[in-house]
């Protein structure tokens, strides 16, 4: 990515990691209700040997309103602690390391990065982040998906209770359940999100359409969010279904995908598309805008400290 405006030196690795973690956590806190709505829409219609029922949730705003009315406003933020834990370890790596890995893969010092090196950087940083952050993803999805309606006893009472119960009843491997679809999803997301943002921002600045500032960051992030949602939705739905499933409901990730296809049709793979885009689009805008600003401010702070000493 291009260096922050007004900066003579590119952001250091520690600045990029800290800025990525902070920006991702802020974006998560603001958009989390949309993510919860997306999860509920994705698991709707998931049969467990029961006759089909009329949909409870209709559309993203309807889902948010239904959850707030029937389960309380706090339900919209169920799983947020795990979500923030996830971003600290996950986003800081996949976003914070992207520039460094891309530069390492580029042919020479100061040479323009090729599309291949950008994609490879997205694959490597996204894949590494998934293995580290998967337990937090499992807990987040489980807490978002569970309902307290109709006298159902919740599977988990809180974030750390969920970690303990999953590890106890399903083994440590239960905390890495769904790693394969999540790896596929996040490789797609990381490549599309970061590479699209990188290329869009570079094109806008180099062609003098926009300066490297807020409007450029906003537009680049919005385009990246839409492209990412289109490509990642099918894998995201399968990942959510598989991670949330009870033991032995699906024998494997392909079995989960085939069950969805045969019972619900191909459109099931795009369930929750609108909330996914609203969430990813808004998440991208908030995260990238904050990421750029945090990098700039952290570099300024570092230079101020250096001058003072």
UniProtKB/Swiss-Prot annotation:
Solcar repeats lie at residues 11-104, 113-203, 212-297. Gene3D superfamilies: Mitochondrial carrier domain. Keywords: Ion channel, Ion transport, Membrane, Mitochondrion, Mitochondrion inner membrane, Oxidation, Repeat, Transmembrane, Transmembrane helix, Transport. One of its GO terms (biological process) is cellular response to reactive oxygen species. Pfam families: Mito_carr (PF00153). The keyword Transmembrane helix applies. The keyword Membrane applies. Residues 1-10, 99-118, 198-214, 292-309 are mitochondrial intermembrane. Most probably functions as a monomer. Binds one purine nucleotide per monomer. However, has also been suggested to function as a homodimer or a homotetramer. Tightly associates with cardiolipin in the mitochondrion inner membrane; may stabilize and regulate its activity. This is Mitochondrial brown fat uncoupling protein 1. It comes from Canis lupus familiaris. The gene is UCP1.
């Amino acid at each position: 990515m291009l260096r922050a405006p007004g900066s003579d030196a590119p952001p250091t690795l520690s600045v990029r990691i800290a800025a990525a973690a902070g920006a991702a956590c802020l974006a998560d806190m603001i958009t989390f209700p949309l993510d919860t709505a997306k999860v509920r829409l994705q698991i709707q219609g998931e049969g467990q040997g029961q006759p089909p029922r009329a949909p409870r949730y209709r559309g993203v705003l309807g889902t948010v309103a239904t959850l707030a009315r029937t389960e309380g406003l706090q339900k919209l933020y169920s799983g947020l602690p795990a979500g923030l834990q996830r971003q600290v370890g996950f986003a800081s790596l996949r976003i914070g390391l992207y520039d460094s890995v891309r530069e390492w893969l580029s042919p020479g010092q100061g040479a323009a990065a090729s599309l291949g090196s950008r994609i490879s950087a997205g694959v490597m940083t996204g894949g590494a982040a998934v293995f580290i952050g998967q337990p937090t993803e499992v807990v987040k999805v489980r807490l978002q998906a569970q309902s307290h309606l109709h006298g159902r006893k919740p599977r988990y009472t809180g974030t750390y209770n969920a970690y303990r119960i999953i590890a106890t009843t399903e083994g440590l491997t239960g905390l890495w359940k769904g790693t394969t679809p999540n790896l596929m999803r996040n490789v797609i997301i990381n490549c599309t999100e970061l590479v699209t943002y990188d290329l869009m921002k570079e094109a806008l600045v180099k062609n003098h359409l926009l300066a490297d500032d807020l409007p450029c960051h906003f537009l680049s992030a919005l385009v990246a969010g839409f492209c990412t949602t289109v490509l990642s939705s099918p894998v995201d739905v399968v990942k959510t279904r598989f991670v949330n499933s009870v033991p032995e409901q699906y024998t494997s990730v392909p079995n989960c995908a085939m069950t969805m296809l045969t019972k619900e049709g191909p459109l099931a793979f795009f369930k929750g598309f609108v909330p996914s885009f609203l969430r990813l689009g808004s998440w991208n805008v908030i995260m990238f805008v904050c990421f750029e600003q945090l990098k700039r401010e952290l570099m300024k702070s570092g230079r101020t400290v250096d001058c003072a000493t």
